[in-house]
Amino acid sequence: MRLPAGACIFNGGDRGEIALVLSGLGAFSFQDTRRRNHIFSLVPAGRLMGNVDDLTADTVSVTDMALRETEVRLVQRETFLAFLDSNPEIERSHALGVIADHESDMEGMIANFTLSARERIAALFSSLVHNLAPEADARGRYPLPFALTAVEISQIVAVARPTVSSILSDLSGRGLLVRRDHRHIVSARLFDILHDRTSRGAGPAARIVRRHRRAPSQSAEQVSLKNQKCQLSDTRTPAFFAGL
């Protein structure tokens, strides 16, 4: 099934759908009291949408949407739950993944409500590098996955598109970002403006200190992404969807 940009799956309740993203890019979002959308998590190919609230049959104010044209494979809630019930190991891995998802989702939401526009963009790029591990070139620069457009970046970080374009142009002029073949390539120096709240063993009550390392670290403040730790460790789950 192909979802056009902005289309949503039916998630939540006792008739919710679960979608395996085959291509494109999905996202989790919610609306504030002014009906503005806020994206707090990205869902790349190979990951699931609708699998969290469909576990509980709760209806929540979160929309599982296609950020761009996205191909998905849909399965009904009852079928998915029956599969988990018959595979306890996968069910446990899935539950752990849900917990990890919520942790990173909260980081993404906090970042988008507390960081400056420039820091949000740097945090998004840092998250893509950390979680999807693109290979650095000879100059220590990282090609970002997904070839995000300025419009998509503005949607993700909740910043007006002209502001995003202005920041990207400034980063390019300072040698921190290069655009090649519709793809952004970023220098690790861009991440120097981010903070590491766990640096030097800092706890929740400790003062946040600036991170001085040039290479990105796993503990950098980052916008949420369905990352590698959230991925189901058992390869039978994709096989289950392939057989539908």
Language model features with spans:
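A residue-level structural signature of the nucleotidyltransferase/glycosyltransferase Rossmann-like core
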Residues: 18, 40, 72-73, 145, ...
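Cyclic-nucleotide recognition modules
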Residues: 41-107
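Hydrophobic/basic alpha-helical segments enriched in Actinobacteria
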Residues: 16, 26-28, 32-38, 47, ...
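Phosphate-/nucleic-acid-contacting segments
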Residues: 130-230, 240-244
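Cyclic nucleotide-binding regulatory domains
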Residues: 7-68
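Polybasic "coupling" helices that flank or enter modular domains
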Residues: 92-156
